Amino acid sequence: MNKMERQQQIKRIIQAEHIGTQEDIKNHLQKEGIVVTQATLSRDLRAIGLLKLRDEQGKLYYSLSEPVATPFSPEVRFYVLKVDRAGFMLVLHTNLGEADVLANLIDNDAIEDILGTIAGADTLLVICRDEEIAKRFEKDLAAGL
């Protein structure tokens, strides 16, 4: 089996199953008679451009879907360790001393649907225009964790 055929099989597996680890993908391939090393599988996944997302229970899984356009600058995801939502507000958890940096990044993005931010030492409160927007931002930020 050549590289292209193997990558097509991986895509098919990802679309058919809720796969969370490379080991799971490797096991599915082995069941189909395809033996692959961890290094080769890792290169294949990178070439395919799989995304690692979180489901409603917080479990990671691979997805082929294209990333949703985000209103946040790429640096924002670097600082976020955890996201919680309470109605129309988000609570973003960071490392100690990084919440104010994250607040500045979000404020500088000038996102119309964010009314304001309040930063502590390791926690940032983001006030969104409404609950639906908060849900969308929560999903967007959580997908990058």
From Swiss-Prot:
Q: Which UniProt keywords apply?
A: Amino-acid biosynthesis, Arginine biosynthesis, Cytoplasm, DNA-binding, Repressor, Transcription, Transcription regulation
Q: Which GO terms describe its cellular component?
A: cytoplasm
Gene Ontology process terms (BP): L-arginine biosynthetic process; protein complex oligomerization; regulation of arginine biosynthetic process
The record's disulfide annotation reads none
Q: Mind telling me which Gene3D superfamilies this protein's record contains?
A: 3.30.1360.40, Winged helix-like DNA-binding domain superfamily/Winged helix DNA-binding domain (1.10.10.10)
**Entry GO MF terms:** arginine binding; DNA binding; DNA-binding transcription factor activity
Keyword hit for tRNA-binding: no
- Subcellular location as annotated: Cytoplasm
* Protein purpose: Regulates arginine biosynthesis genes.
Q: What protein does this entry describe? A: Arginine repressor
Organism of origin is Streptococcus pyogenes serotype M3 (strain ATCC BAA-595 / MGAS315)
Gene giving rise to this polypeptide: argR2
